[in-house]
């Protein structure tokens, strides 16, 4: 007993007199507290936090140590209290942001979300109410004011740099080593990069930190020129193959679209998707495994276009925001150019989201038609463009070129966030959903996909009579960001990662139903068309989708993007295209002053057309596709007047062509 008393006395003395021990102990306790609070917000259940502790104790410790390490950085400043509270506030802010993100989608917050975030009024209006935004602004102002006061008033403490450095290095090394310890010790297998599974099994702090540093495809252990040649031997030997009459190929990526009839015991006032169900019965179809749930449109897009597996990249990574910012990548657009197809992208949303305006030239596309180049666009209740505008744009793209076309179309109408109360929800949930909020969201969603279903019927009616052979590939990019659990789905009809695809044609394309992953869809479509061109098209078509297939695909992907490009004989064979925006020229015919207003006349103007005078943007009023106007204040004879298409975030996309002789 005396020994225990002496030990406790010694420990107390260290705590009382040893500021070094107190500092690091405070960081550890702060990290433990932060981890419990952040996990509680993420899992919304204290018992679920303890399940993480019980099932993956090392993972729980890893999160605590990551937070402890970040807090330990405050010990290098005399104002350790201020910087400790500041660092803790940042982590709490991330936890709150994650809680908010999870209120309208399934996947947790990751570092890439800050790269793709667009804080314009259209974004705020969809995902946040005006009162909530005002409260957020007030909270941020109060927080900043509080931090300023704290900085002025917090006491100063001595800095023990050598000790603090040693402790921080030990903490950092522990954070790096723990994930690589044997799974039997309690961390578990963490080779996958899906943020949903990682956060669920290993915690938010670990997953978020990993998403900050984990990008690209890791070099395979056995990577070598010999290994790549062995994998690609049959691909390199196989000659390109295609029929003499290659059809138009249209991919139609349907935002958050799935057949709600897959929901168990849920009945609606009418079938929301009768035509889609008819297509599934009469056309080649199957389940389509998306790389994510409730979000991640760009990654589904990336997989279909490039035929690469995004899960081979970093944690939560969007290749659009990393490697494709600088590097061209082989794609179906590049491959089908060999067969003479012009390539287009059509999207009834802004051009700059996910940096598509930067990425698509590096994927080989010739044109990109976006919301900024469309007229007469109707919007739904929460502001997303309705998909029926796409019929006109698809027909226009087919008509504007003499050659056959590859058209990659991206819809947006059923996008979240879904309102709990809707003024436009015509389809009602009759049974199966008791929660009023989810029922209201489901009724809104069902109404939106019903309109999409009608758009699909209209589009196929138009394409049925098109004079050229045309193939239309329909699929949902991912499940909607609704609180749909596995228990609500008929799992015999696919899980949370599965939507469905259909291959329709006006030229009798047939084939057996087959389930695919997103990166296998293009090769599946081309196989039915007797087309075999391109590295990964051949690889997917020539290999059974089992065994070493996934590992070999990963090696090829690494070689093509990050390695020695052995498969391309050491060269980069793909050049960024000179992609144009829209399929029709926007022209300026004349500009003149009338009644103190500058009137600009031309062709193909849209509500996103902005008048520029000597390079300066003017507040512009859209009158029609033939005329735009602005105040003539300060405009003098000889000033250069032009019109540019400007995205919602202010990015200038293109400039009108001067055509003084236009009719």
Residues covered by each model-derived region:
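Transmembrane and membrane-interface helices of multi-pass
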Residues: 2-198, 637-640
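N-terminal leader/auxiliary helical segments
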Residues: 3-16, 20, 24, 132-145, ...
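Membrane-interface micro-motifs in multi-pass membrane enzymes
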Residues: 111, 196-204, 294-295, 385
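Alpha-helix initiation and N-capping motif
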Residues: 114-117, 201-206, 225, 273, ...
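Residue-level preference for non-acidic, small/hydrophobic
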Residues: 120, 249-254
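Membrane-interface segments at or immediately adjacent to transmembrane helices
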Residues: 178-251
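Solvent-exposed soluble domains appended to multi-pass membrane proteins
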Residues: 236-244, 254, 259-663
